Amino acid sequence: MPENEITGATALVTGASRGFGRGIATALSQAGAQVVGVARDRVPLEELRADLGESFTAVSADAADPTVAGQLIDAYHPRILVLNAGATPLPRPVQHHSWQTFSRNWDTDVQHVFHWTREALLAPLAPGSTVITLSSAAALRGSPLSGGYAGAKAAIRFLTAYAAAESDREKLGIRFVSVLPQLTPATALGAVYVAAYAARQDVDVPQGPPLTPERVGRAITDLVTGPGLDQDAYLLTAAGLRPRR
């Protein structure tokens, strides 16, 4: 989508109330989009609405609910769809997980991406639309202290690639791309895991420029508007986007 076309376009962001989702919603709003932010907790959504004004619409809903994706796509007809919602994994080694805690990210992260990508293809979204899913760098290297998290994030990358292939096959003109952010102490979830891995390895918490929600927001906006960013998957670090094949 050319940069001038984002002005007035509807962008729907799941998991918009905190962390990366909040940064993404803010960046898209500042770029001129009309942003629909979806999250279960309405209070932080309303706080974001107070910050962003009329360019932001707060929707309190469970993004993993099988009925929500179709309802909101029909209601708002987004041109930009950012699938960021996810559960917080428990920081413990595999032997201390139950299947319920181990599979938490499959039940939330993967299920929500499945429902929304399915509805984006079935609706379908308008030609020229962009669907961005938030996977994780853990999908490349694993994450032994977070149960099924890494596998769930790898599944999200696969689902996104499958959807891209279906869009091409059906000539729908919908772009699907996955983003794999590195672990960062700049979010509440990331800070817990950075500290946990440092303690496990008996090292200090790594220093250096972190991947902040603001940087993530700018990267997602660049993916939507930037010429040349046409790959199907990108690793995202504090240094920026890097294609993954």
Predicted regions and their residues:
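Rossmann-fold scaffold of SDR-type NAD(P)-dependent oxidoreductases
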Residues: 14, 78-86, 109, 133, ...
